[in-house]
Amino acid sequence: MMDFLKRFFGSSQERILKRFQKLVEEVNACDEKFSSLSDDELRKKTPQLKQRYQDGESLDKLLPEAYGVVKNVCRRLAGTPVEVSGYHQQWDMVPYDVQILGAIAMHKGFITEMQTGEGKTLTAVMPLYLNALTGKPVHLVTVNDYLAQRDCEWVGSVLRWLGLTTGVLVSGSPPEKRKAIYQCDVVYGTASEFGFDYLRDNSIATRKEEQVGRGFYFAIIDEIDSVLIDEARTPLIISGPGEKHNPVYFELKDRVAELVYFQREMCNHIAIEARKVLDPFLGTDVLPKDKKVMEAISEACRALWLVSKGMPLNRVLRRVREHPDLRAMIDKWDVFYHAEQNKEQCLEKLSSLYIVVDEHNNDFELTDKGMLQWIEKIGGAAEDFVMMDMGHEYALIEEDATLSPADKLNRKIAVSEKDTQRKARAHGLRQLLRAHLLMEKDIDYIVRDDQIVIIDEHTGRPQSGRRFSEGLHQAIEAKEHVTIRKESQTFATVTLQNFFRLYEKLAGMTGTAITESREFKEIYSLYVLQVPTFKPCLRIDHNDAFYMTEREKYQAIVAEIISAHRSGKPILIGTESVEVSEKLSRILRQNRINHTVLNAKNHAQEAEIIAGAGKVGAVTVATNMAGRGTDIKLDEEAVAAGGLYVIGTSRHQSRRIDRQLRGRCARLGDPGAAKFFLSFEDRLMRLFASPKLNTLIRHFRPPEGEAMSDPMFDRLIETAQKRVEGRNYTIRKHTLEYDDVMNKQRQTIYAFRNDVLHAEDLFVVAKEQIEHVALALAFLILKDAHADHCSLPKIEEWLSYSFPVKLDDQEIRRLGDVDAVADYIGDLLIEAFDVKFSAMLAEFTEIIGSAANAQGICNDILRSVIISHIDEEWKVHLVDMDLLRSEVGLRSVGQKDPLIEFKNESFLLFEGLIRDIRIAIVKHLFALELSLTRSDRPDNAIPTVATAFHNHDNFRPMELTIVGEEEES
């Protein structure tokens, strides 16, 4: 039925394109009409359109004229030089109809899928211009600084010709210039630069003058699938060095390495013994039918199954798995042990290992044997890794009648500190094991200049400046024997998912989005529109070539490279990691094939390498770095030879990454071809392929070195990729559900902080905090007054110690009502506050000689006090939330929903945070003592006072002393 309706009415994509096509015709008509205008007359269109918007016309109504203006300017600029990255380039671009289609879609809030070379950069200029007419912030988000700078200089020239201002944010942009950049009509920059400025404005700035942003209206994200999907699980974090250096990584690194060594040696021994049995059959196609021999083979495969749980990448195991029948037998044991009735046998078998490694879920578990071995290694310090039952420990302290209340409190503090130390050591042990067992050099990271540099799993690019969180980075540093740096403390954090939700309007463009359309729709409410190509795509997509083993696959790849190289075709070989790129490079050198390698280790030469990759006879081996954001242009000889030939050495877990690699060739009507070479030992096939795979292999096994190619195998690959994509989508959605809780709290705190920064009268803000504290105290006092063991005198003692007031017990009992008691306490505190700060204000006025300036100084002082406590308590809260997030997963064991538990407990934590902030502010205000000392000063010295207070510097004209706060710090 649906197919019939689609044939009759067209698909939703076709209907949208048809509707937008009418607008394209209007745009072209406007372009033709504007051709008769002079340059000055055309430039005047910008203020005219702005005024019409201010007068109430919608952007949708202005779209045809605005886009027509941009197209006409592009036509007028043809042949003129534009300086881009220090070079003069000749402008040669006028938007095609398909580009105008994409531009209309982006203004409407779509993600436009446009193929490589179709001109996404120029397409974005039109919606940028249209939305900039509002005077609101308009941002173009790129994947790196180079593209931001290039696009601003190149296509930004159109916007500047029309009288708009453009700015570019790069990592080196100084703070003092960022505010001016954000004032521009259109700003180019990376997601991290925009995101970090948002965090700095809301967590680092201590005055409104230090804030640089001016809001979030419209953003176009280039390579939107990379930013919102690949990077979705990587939050932006502003952090600083932690207060203490955790020595656990240095102390335990050798012992952990030894434990992993024991595991490796044990697995090697088991594998070697199994191979002795299996060696005679590795070169045969059919296993013997003798019952005793088959029993021995089965037991050897059972032993290798155990090896797969201890060292999944063991060489003997991988060699044996090349034989389809032996591979099927190992997998049969895996199915056997996973059956419910065989769980006890499985646990008994696994107990012989020190550590069980779950490669599929990227996890591991220390067995009882491993724990005993660990205890033996650390000797008497074993209990340092045993978690304490805090409820039981506290109960023992309470039951001890010999302890005074003060002693009990001190004991509880000591027990809590001991528990914290044990958790830190246990966490350090787990991260060291993770570093050794699951993190691989030249795949997950590289070692460079005594540092661990993360490799982005999707782009293959080094991520300098980024660090793995939760101590994993320190654990890898210990593993690789580089300098172990201090753990960082988080000051502010936000995920890209929630950052981009701040924009009123969001759009994007990429060459690969349709496979993730469901996620864009459900999480961001963004729809994907596939825009037709300007010229037909001439790429030849060859069927995938499947080989039994990795060894056969590489032999076939080299043979294919040699064959294509003889024809003069430029060749781009895509690899999944630095390790594979270097391995293939060694093989090519052995075969005397000149080539260039592009990976995370030599990314600085990327532009130079890519520039030469389209020349006739060029051979380039690259990681996923070459799969996105690169445009390989062919010379005439290369086009004549058949264009760029793309060879994939494996399928990525995401179909998008494969499509990106294919998209490097056959750009804008050029010839080209793409082919993937796969083996059944590839990670994707090994971990995520269908169980039917072994049956297929046994039936279709070809002779050594011969490829298999069948639509059935293509479906297997697609099924495996969909399975991984579904799992990753679930993880991202799950992460977002937790971050949504944090996001609401973040927005509340940032709104409070901004109110303080922008408040004109901080005395009013301070009194509001006093009233909140008074209400909290009223609840506490009245709740305690009705308790069996009333400690009202202790509360009053604490109150009189913290604040310069004394409560009247009889008055409190007479009032009885929470609101009345809160008003009573609030009046006392506000009266004391007024007395204190009125005297201070009078003293400042006398010294300065200006009541307005004295008021300004007092406002700055109050603002600094309030902001400092918001920031300090928020940092502590972030740590508490991280701990809660890591612990709440265990609640599922008790049949509780971890997310519901997280929401409930985080709400209680947030209530405590707000209370703690307010109490800390009010206590500080009453403990604060300030004095201004007369000195020789210039007339412009007053602003220096406020600045010096913020920076805690010594300053000359007046001396500011803060006392009474040491106990709080």
Swiss-Prot record:
It is found in: Cell inner membrane; Cytoplasm. InterPro entries: Helicase_ATP-bd, Helicase_C-like, P-loop_NTPase, SecA, SecA_CS, SecA_DEAD, SecA_motor_DEAD, SecA_preprotein_X-link_dom. Its main location: membrane. CDD domains: DEXDc_SecA, SF2_C_secA. It catalyses: ATP + H2O + cellular proteinSide 1 = ADP + phosphate + cellular proteinSide 2. One of its GO terms (molecular function) is ATP binding. GO terms for cellular component: cell envelope Sec protein transport complex; cytosol; plasma membrane. Disulfide bonds: none annotated. It is a peripheral membrane protein. ATP binds at residues 99, 117-121, 631. SMART domains: SecA_DEAD, SecA_PP_bind. SUPFAM superfamilies: Helical scaffold and wing domains of SecA, P-loop containing nucleoside triphosphate hydrolases, Pre-protein crosslinking domain of SecA. Its EC number is 7.4.2.8. It comes from the Bacteria. Keywords: ATP-binding, Cell inner membrane, Cell membrane, Cytoplasm, Membrane, Nucleotide-binding, Protein transport, Translocase, Translocation, Transport. Belongs to the SecA family. Monomer and homodimer. Part of the essential Sec protein translocation apparatus which comprises SecA, SecYEG and auxiliary proteins SecDF. Other proteins may also be involved. This is Protein translocase subunit SecA. It comes from Chlamydia trachomatis serovar A (strain ATCC VR-571B / DSM 19440 / HAR-13).
